[in-house]
From Swiss-Prot:
Protein name per UniProt: Non-structural protein 1
Function: Plays a role in the inhibition of host innate immunity by inducing the degradation of key host factors required to activate interferon production such as IRF3, IRF5 or IRF7. Associates with components of cullin RING ligases (CRLs) including CUL1 or CUL3, which are essential multisubunit ubiquitination complexes, to modulate their activities. Recognizes the host NF-kappa-B regulator BTRC through the presence of a DSGXS motif in the C-terminal substrate recognition domain.
Region of interest called RNA-binding, as start-end residue ranges on this chain: 1-81
Keyword Transport: no
Cell compartment(s), UniProt: Host cytoplasm, Host cytoskeleton
Swiss-Prot/TrEMBL keywords: Host cytoplasm, Host cytoskeleton, Host-virus interaction, Inhibition of host innate immune response by virus, Inhibition of host IRF3 by virus, Inhibition of host IRF7 by virus, Inhibition of host NF-kappa-B by virus, Inhibition of host RLR pathway by virus, Interferon antiviral system evasion, Metal-binding, Phosphoprotein, RNA-binding, Viral immunoevasion
Main location: host cell
Oligomer and partners: Interacts (via C-terminus) with host IRF3; this interaction leads to IRF3 degradation. Interacts with host IRF7; this interaction leads to IRF7 degradation. Interacts with host CUL1 and CUL3. Interacts with host BTRC.
GO biological process: symbiont-mediated suppression of host cytoplasmic pattern recognition receptor signaling pathway via inhibition of IRF3 activity; symbiont-mediated suppression of host cytoplasmic pattern recognition receptor signaling pathway via inhibition of IRF7 activity; symbiont-mediated suppression of host NF-kappaB cascade
Domain comment in the entry: The integrity of the zinc-binding domain in NSP1 is important for degradation of host IRF3. The pLxIS motif targets host IRF3 for degradation; however phosphorylation of NSP1 pLxIS motif is not required for its activity.
Motif segment (IKBKB-like degron (ILD) motif): 479-483
Annotated region described as Zinc-binding domain, given as residue ranges: 42-79
GO CC annotations, alphabetized: host cell cytoplasm; host cytoskeleton
Length: 486
């Protein structure tokens, strides 16, 4: 059993404040939610289990039981998960406030210990001090947290997470902030709590405390598209697709890291809870991460042999050719923008090949083919640059002075011609490597200008940022007929 979950279950009965704050979905009647095979720690109840996606941010971080309350660490309501979430520069004072909150919600004193021991003996006829019966008393106060970085903002979700060596398929990594506080002060807090426990339980408490307070922080995990709801990935091909998210909101107006102080003023806390409500947002999936996912999908299904062919048709419209025909039934082609990018890039590269080499058939096995797939993923700059340089060198450039040049005297389609005119001023007959890079960049940036995109989608915005975008009507920056340039 998860220690944090058990502590919330038993301490919830202590008083009115605890009953409101420590209410977890995992301790209530089960309501079904989409099952998944993602393993990790539920941020709400801290147990290691199968996770489902959060309705607030679309990241897999909540178990199927806690999902019924729809809590997210990015909410603007003072529920327990939000009060345990700290942001960016965490100070010693912030950590002291967190420890105070733990002491308020999970007190360990003689009265509390006697009450729990008497209840256990009375109801279960248990006269021994077996740790599993007193799991709720054995939750030490630590500065153990799961951390995630979202576009420059780092979030720390504090809690007591068991079994830290278990499989972690989430973008959250364990971080120990004890050095930001004071080891001796934290030791003193826990030794004081431990002194009220029977000797056998003291030993177990000490083992748990030191194992969770002296560990070395993990390296940051890189968030990627697989950490988000599969529903999003399945609909990315639709240019009009919107992500629907819900956020728990209230009139809480404290500094982000000071939310945990609200439990010290019970009256104010319940006044804020009375203003709690749910807000719904439709946001765009446009971000660097999902754009890269789409561009990689294109690179996997194109036919590199097209660049050495003589077909009159565009790359996505070639039929009955063993080497050049693509499967037009694939869902990736439902996005006309990806189709346009594919047609233009391959048309431009083919024109360069025809202008500078004698290759004349799509069945040819050429060295240049190995560079074609990587020229679509502009988000991976190093690999993209290497592929463009590889293509350029395969065209046997001529050196004049300190520069290398290639020819362009083969026809290109109208879209490619417009790109060249827009960026170079005319359709040139001689190109440098920089000209080629500029042209290829423009063919992608016209639709997906990743230079100005967030890495993660707007589902990871805080509520105040979502409200700002909503006020300017920019939560959904999509239009099926307008490119980034337009």
């Amino acid at each position: 059993m998860a220690t944090f979950k058990d502590a919330c279950y038993y301490y919830k009965r202590l008083n009115k404040l605890n009953h409101a704050v420590l209410k977890l979905g995992v301790n209530d009647a089960w309501r079904p939610s989409p099952p998944t095979k993602y393993k990790g720690w539920c941020l709400d109840c801290c147990q290691h289990t199968d996770l489902t996606y959060c309705r607030g941010c679309s990241i897999y971080h909540v178990c199927q039981w806690c999902n019924q309350y729809g809590r997210c660490f990015l909410d603007d309501e003072p529920h327990l998960l939000r009060m345990r979430t700290f942001k960016n520069n965490v100070t010693k004072e912030d950590l002291a406030n967190l420890i105070d909150m733990y002491n308020v919600l999970f007190p360990v004193n003689q009265k509390t210990v006697n009450k729990f021991i008497n209840n256990t003996k009375q109801h279960k006829c248990r006269n021994e001090y077996v740790p599993q019966w007193y799991n709720h008393l054995l939750m030490p106060i630590t500065l153990q947290s799961l951390s995630i970085e979202l576009d420059g903002d780092t979030y720390y979700i504090f809690g007591y997470y068991d079994n830290m060596k278990n499989i972690n398929q989430t973008p959250f990594s364990f971080v120990n902030l004890i050095d930001m506080y004071d080891k001796l002060l934290l030791d003193d807090v826990n030794f004081n709590r431990m002194s009220f426990l029977p000797l056998i339980l003291q030993q177990e408490y000490a083992l748990r405390y030191f194992s969770k307070s002296r560990f070395i922080s993990e390296e940051k995990r890189q968030i990627n598209h697989s950490h988000f709801s599969i529903n999003i990935l399945e609909n990315l091909h639709n240019p009009n697709f919107k992500i629907q998210i819900t956020r728990n909101c209230s009139t809480m107006s404290v500094r982000w890291n000071e939310a945990c102080k609200l439990v010290k003023d019970v009256g104010t806390y319940f006044d804020i809870l009375k203003t709690s409500h749910v807000e719904f947002y439709d946001v765009s999936p446009r971000c660097r991460m999902f754009t890269q996912h789409k561009l990689k999908a294109v690179s996997k299904v194109i036919k590199p042999n097209y660049v050495t062919s003589n077909h009159r048709a565009l790359a996505t419209e070639v039929h009955n050719c063993r080497w050049c025909s693509v499967n037009n039934n694939l869902i990736v082609w439902n996005d006309f923008r990806l189709r346009n990018i594919c047609d233009n890039i391959l048309n431009f590269i083919r024109a360069l090949i025809k202008s500078n080499t004698g290759i004349g058939h799509c069945s040819s096995q050429e060295r240049i083919h190995i560079y074609i797939r990587d020229v679509f993923d502009v988000c991976d700059e190093s690999k993209w640059n290497a592929s463009v340089v590889g293509i350029f060198n395969c065209l046997e450039p001529v050196e004049l002075g300190n520069a290398h040049y290639i020819l362009l005297n083969h026809e290109v389609n109208w879209d490619v011609a417009n790109v060249l005119i827009q960026n170079i001023g005319k359709i040139p007959q001689i190109l440098t490597l920089n000209d080629v890079i500029t042209a290829l960049h423009s063919m992608i940036y016209d639709w997906f200008d990743v230079r100005y995109m967030r890495n993660t989608p707007t589902t990871t915005f805080t509520v105040d940022k979502l409200k700002q975008l909503c006020a300017r009507r920019k939560t959904v920056d999509y239009d099926s007929g307008v490119s980034d340039v337009e």
